[in-house]
Amino acid sequence: MSYDASAIRVLKGLEGVRHRPAMYIGGTGVEGYHHLFKEILDNAVDEALAGYATEILVRLNEDGSLTVEDNGRGIPVDLMPEEGKPAVEVIYTTLHSGGKFEQGAYKVSGGLHGVGASVVNALSEWTVVEVFREGKHHRIAFSRGEVTEPLRVVGEAPRGKTGTRVTFKPDPEIFGNLRFDPSKIRARLREVAYLVAGLKLVFQDRQHGKEEVFLDKGGVASFAKALAEGEDLLYEKPFLIRGTHGEVEVEVGFLHTQGYNAEILTYANMIPTRDGGTHLTAFKSAYSRALNQYAKKAGLNKEKGPQPTGDDLLEGLYAVVSVKLPNPQFEGQTKGKLLNPEAGTAVGQVVYERLLEILEENPRIAKAVYEKALRAAQAREAARKARELVRRQNPLESDELPGKLADCQTENPEEAELFIVEGDSAGGSAKQGRDRRFQAILPLRGKILNVEKAGLSKALKNAEVRAMVSAIGVGIGGDGEAHFDLEGLRYHKIIIMTDADVDGSHIRTLLLTFFYRYMRPLIERGHVYIAQPPLYRLQVGKKVEYLYSDEELQARLKELEGKHYEVQRFKGLGEMNPEQLWETTMNPEKRVLKRVELQDALEASELFEKLMGQEVAPRREFIEEHARYAELDI
């Protein structure tokens, strides 16, 4: 094929967005789909941050479309002389356009690249924008980025009404049969309500006939307390740090618990920065410096014994760090990591100075926090030997792998799969049925320790936990911690394979709790999966098929009315012979795997605490609330 001018294609307008959507929204799966909603919501939130909007309505419509409406100023509708088009049309049809580029329009905004509105428009089957401004109701419509109805006045605006209403339906040509998930919408609205204290957000779910209002006046301090819900608190009232350095506004809410977990959520201009950035690094550093400085001055620092590290000082801390700044620089369009050095400088200075004041004003709390860090240092030292199990010269060649691990032959972690299997009998079938070239099997005996109730040192004394830590090879902890190293990951797919009954569900929950609390980066990077073993074996004549749910079975039996068939229900993995287990659950060509994803850290943390934590009352409430949805297998 010749490579000349004829081979070069220029993508015009928004065609490039439709051609390569992942460049703009990170992918065309569930996350990318909901990213469209977040982009339009961000625009409405920007109006609130600028002081012009006090209420945002989000409506999930019966046809699957979504409406976002604010009571701000309304997108400008006058002509742009250089474009010869109304401003609202330019914003929705041109990349890198919008008020965010004009210094006076928005002091702070989350819409960094000026592509949000136009990208949503390009990736939607249709979009309708209505503007209420200067007493008039304006409307313009689009389809897949092209204008289908030019801007026109469709009537008078209700008296005093201003703002923008955007309704859009993501394009099935891009996203297939995906739909909006109300829980994801709810989670983001709740997040925004905490981050913009006093902003009223209303969610109308027309598909399920529900309406919810999110409004919080406590801001990030309330957010931190919600994050720690269900934990035993070291003190009741969360602290709030607020300050400005240069053009950067800093807000931090924090609270200490008696538990072993730490949770720090970070935001820049209301955008969740899942991968942290300069503000997170500066917060951790300033927090540690202030605590150490106070401890030294107050004589709390004992020279004997292990000294607290940064991780020890953070143990039990629940914090929310929010910065607002002009011209934020993020890594990638999906805004996962903040890069601005001035954000780090501001957070470092504001947090260090104000935290020292808080510690000096609250000596009893300061002493309790530092003594907890000293205990964490002692526990870390006690766990050091256990951690040595997972330090390897070569992650794929080690004499310290657990004896019951049936390892695979490949030395390429990207090809390797680890099946964590419930019970020795199922483990035996899995070992015989697997493809030993790339599949490893680790059978677990009985139920593993509930790490939500146990500390790290106790967890590392548990044989099943130690076997998993040793086999997986990354250590324990989070990104950037000395004892956690993703480079050591021996298997890029870690597959939890348990029975489809109540006991299996419990073991699966215990394992997920372990991964969430002590190996969360594996979940965040998509390495943890749940196998879906079949519930039924259906034989019609000589033909055998496997069914994975009661609904699937009922639908199939309806088709077979009047015919002779045999149905076998699998109560556990051990009932399947090695060939059946391979064919139904392990064969990459035929199996069904569910990837474990972490969309909302606050919701996940609360759920694990409710299900697996010390407090009985929240667990009882959860069970009573969800009992009507349960399927009993008695």
From Swiss-Prot:
A type II topoisomerase that negatively supercoils closed circular double-stranded (ds) DNA in an ATP-dependent manner. It probably also catalyzes the interconversion of other topological isomers of double-stranded DNA rings, including catenanes. Relaxes negatively supercoiled DNA in an ATP-independent manner. At comparable concentrations T.thermophilus gyrase does not introduce as many negative supercoils into DNA as the E.coli enzyme. Negative supercoiling favors strand separation, and DNA replication, transcription, recombination and repair, all of which involve strand separation. Type II topoisomerases break and join 2 DNA strands simultaneously in an ATP-dependent manner. It is an enzyme of class 5 (isomerase). NCBIfam families: gyrB, PRK05644.1, PRK14939.1. GO terms for cellular component: chromosome; cytoplasm. Keywords: ATP-binding, Cytoplasm, DNA-binding, Isomerase, Magnesium, Metal-binding, Nucleotide-binding, Topoisomerase. GO terms for biological process: DNA topological change; DNA-templated DNA replication. Gene3D superfamilies: 3.30.230.10, 3.40.50.670, Histidine kinase-like ATPase, C-terminal domain. Belongs to the type II topoisomerase GyrB family. Consists of 3 domains; the ATPase domain (residues 1-220), the transducer domain (221-390) and the toprim domain (391-634). Removal of the N-terminal ATPase domain (residues 2-392) increases ATP-independent DNA relaxation, showing it is not required for DNA binding or cleavage, this enzyme still has some supercoiling activity, but in this case it introduces positive supercoils. It is found in: Cytoplasm. This is DNA gyrase subunit B. For the electron microscopy studies a GyrB-GyrA fusion protein was made with a Gly-Asp-Leu linker between the 2 subunits. It forms the expected dimer. The keyword Cytoplasm applies. Mg(2+) 1 binds at residues 422, 499. It catalyses: ATP-dependent breakage, passage and rejoining of double-stranded DNA. Its cofactor is Mg(2+); Mn(2+); Ca(2+). Coiled coil: none annotated.
